[in-house]
């Protein structure tokens, strides 16, 4: 599973995929916008999809998820600071981590239609789920 994801991950453009995924999250699940009030205009799907702060943060998030691939045995420790930050400072509902993982899967499937096998989807979902669990650690 993780070898499959690692091999695939090198093809993923964090800027394009990450930005699109975070923008999609904010459009599809509008209540998540409350965590991004400092990001400027989130008034429409078009505004969100062209918002430079949204796109940059999406890239940052996807890059951080990719970094987790280097620490598969120790995700909770790897993401401990981010978990604390999202829990204590941002008060992000941890259910949103799963939503974002689902949106990433959707966007990756859209961009990599021919390579997006059920096996790859399974491996990606396992990784996103593990990252979400690690990020939710500070909530327990």
Swiss-Prot record:
Red blood cells. GO terms for cellular component: blood microparticle; haptoglobin-hemoglobin complex; hemoglobin complex. Residues 1-140 form the Globin domain. One of its GO terms (biological process) is hydrogen peroxide catabolic process. Gene3D superfamilies: Globins (1.10.490.10). Heme b binds at residues 57, 86. It comes from the Eukaryota. Belongs to the globin family. Involved in oxygen transport from the lung to the various peripheral tissues. Heterotetramer of two alpha chains and two beta chains. This is Hemoglobin subunit beta. It comes from Pelophylax lessonae.
